[in-house]
């Protein structure tokens, strides 16, 4: 809930001459303290119209620390919530500390995620194969370029054939892989089928076949970290798509069980560098609310990210945006996008780590968040070399 609290305010607050918003949602998670009133800021994303969020700030501003603190608070306070992280820099030591599963993805990794994994709840109440076929088409386009109608028809037909036994068994048992799909393609009479099979060979039966094998990691752990640090340029575009689809599988499965899912996408701008992962993320971003899921994007590259219309729309429509210390050009972009005044911008100008401005619904609140350095939790969260 939001309350208007009459207090004496400093003139640089920029919030109101004599009122501040007191943010204290029922079952809220600690975000920090109001920089003016010192009141706790407790946020429950399910209370917002759109529970997705962003954490932004320059390197060293404290965004990683804030995200990890949010993860720990969610993990410990809500036993009915699962956490998923995409980690490009291998910075989330808290995964192992909390008994989570780190899935290391690369061309040489022993960990594998099957690109064709599909649970019975994948289809949003409809035939799951319809939605999965769309994903397979996007995956193939990412691998070989734009597809014409003949190619799309062939892939759709072969996808149905590959999944036939799995669907007849009620989505139980052995899930087909891209190797099975390619085998079906090679059995088709059309020239297009043979061309597609050849085009995807490198990623199915060649050196980069890590997503064409059965999943061999625990994707049901309460805390999953997709470690993409070693994924490489060749595999990054397809890897991003497969990881996002794996996350969708978990979200839809959790919805059927009545569980919440919190997804943290570190360096989210990486997803916007590739058309198909950006489109998939945008669709996921719009849909997850009804699935009981919430996505947080973390980035220091606001100006670059906002060159994507998709990213701009997502940021503008987010009800929770945490802004830490910002570069000058990023401050200008944020002010334009969110209507932030010069006075309010002072809270994200040369700000100390953990200090900033947070947009919560229609409120803009200056905040501070400090975690004592003499704690094991701080040491687990810190990304500083000698801490």
Segment roles from a protein language model:
Residues 1-16, 58-59, 305-387:
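C-terminal regions of RecA-like/P-loop NTPase motor modules
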Residues 299:
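H-loop/switch region of ABC-family ATPase nucleotide-binding domains
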Residues 50:
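Short coil/loop residues immediately preceding or within conserved phosphate-binding loops
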Residues 1-41, 46, 90-293, 306-309, ...:
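P-loop NTPase motor domains
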Residues 55:
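Hydrophobic anchor at the beta1->P-loop junction of P-loop NTPases
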């Amino acid at each position: 809930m939001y309350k208007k609290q009459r207090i004496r305010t400093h003139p640089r607050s920029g919030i109101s001459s004599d009122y501040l918003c007191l943010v204290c949602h029922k079952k809220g998670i600690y975000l920090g303290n109001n920089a003016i009133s010192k009141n706790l800021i407790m946020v429950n994303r399910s209370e917002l119209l759109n529970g997705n969020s962003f954490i932004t700030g320059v390197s060293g501003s404290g965004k990683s620390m804030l995200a990890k603190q949010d993860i720990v608070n969610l993990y410990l306070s809500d036993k009915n919530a699962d956490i998923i992280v995409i980690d490009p820099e291998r910075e989330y030591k808290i995964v192992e500390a909390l008994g989570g599963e780190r899935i290391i993805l690369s061309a040489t990794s022993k960990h594998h995620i099957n690109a064709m994994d599909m649970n019975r709840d994948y289809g949003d109440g409809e035939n799951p194969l319809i939605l999965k076929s769309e994903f397979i088409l996007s995956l193939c386009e990412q691998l070989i370029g734009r597809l014409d109608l003949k190619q799309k028809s062939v892939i759709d037909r072969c996808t149905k054939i590959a999944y036939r036994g799995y669907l007849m068994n009620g989505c139980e048992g052995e899930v087909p892989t891209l190797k099975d799909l390619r085998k079906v393609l090679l059995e088709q009479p059309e020239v297009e089928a043979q061309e597609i099979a050849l085009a995807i060979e490198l990623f199915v039966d060649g050196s980069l076949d890590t997503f064409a094998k059965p999943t061999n990691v625990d994707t049901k752990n309460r805390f999953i970290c997709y470690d993409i640090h070693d994924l490489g340029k060749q595999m990054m575009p397809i890897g991003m798509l497969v990881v996002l689809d794996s996350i969708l599988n978990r979200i839809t499965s959790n919805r059927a069980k009545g569980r919440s899912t919190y997804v943290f996408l570190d360096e989210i701008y990486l997803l916007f560098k590739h058309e198909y992962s950006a489109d998939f993320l945008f669709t996921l971003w719009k849909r997850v609310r009804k699935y009981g899921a919430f996505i947080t994007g973390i980035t220091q590259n606001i100006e670059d990210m906002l060159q994507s219309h998709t990213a701009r729309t997502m940021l503008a429509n987010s009800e929770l945006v945490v802004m830490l210390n910002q570069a000058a050009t990023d401050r200008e972009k944020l002010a334009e996008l969110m209507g932030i005044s010069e006075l309010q911008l002072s809270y994200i100008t040369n700000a100390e780590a953990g200090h900033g401005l947070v947009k919560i619904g229609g409120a803009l609140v200056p905040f501070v968040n400090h975690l004592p350095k003499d704690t094991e939790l701080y040491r687990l969260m810190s990304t500083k070399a000698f801490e």
